[in-house]
């Protein structure tokens, strides 16, 4: 048994979708996404720049910061392949930083859907009983 949908209802739904996508609320949502820290940090890799399909420069990050001096200002990751003053190779520095970051992420408790997962048990963030 099929459901019958009249053409006029499809047209009305199409017009509603068109109106919503062109409205101020939708553009505000798009604008708020573009001003989010994630988009500012990684958005340059997803959107096209003035060069069309040209690959991004190695001396600039996605948010337009210049890293030609070898250090990324935000994360402090050593990007240059020149040897540092302390004699440690840049590959070793990067490897150590990535291992440290992985350890920090591993130790952080995961949060999903209002619950914190610790030791394989699901604990609610809100306590419903008396403590």
Swiss-Prot record:
The modification Phenylalanine amide is found at residue 119. One of its GO terms (molecular function) is orexigenic neuropeptide QRFP receptor binding. Residues 97-106 have a biased composition (Polar residues). The keyword Disulfide bond does not apply. Belongs to the RFamide neuropeptide family. The gene is QRFP. Pfam families: RFamide_26RFa. Ligand for the G-protein coupled receptor QRFPR. Residues 26-94, 123-131 form a propeptide. It is found in: Secreted. GO terms for cellular component: extracellular region. Keywords: Amidation, Cleavage on pair of basic residues, Secreted, Signal. Residues 1-25 form the signal peptide. Residues 48-131 are annotated as: Disordered. It comes from the Eukaryota. Residues 120-131 have a biased composition (Basic and acidic residues). The keyword Signal applies. This is QRFP-like peptide.
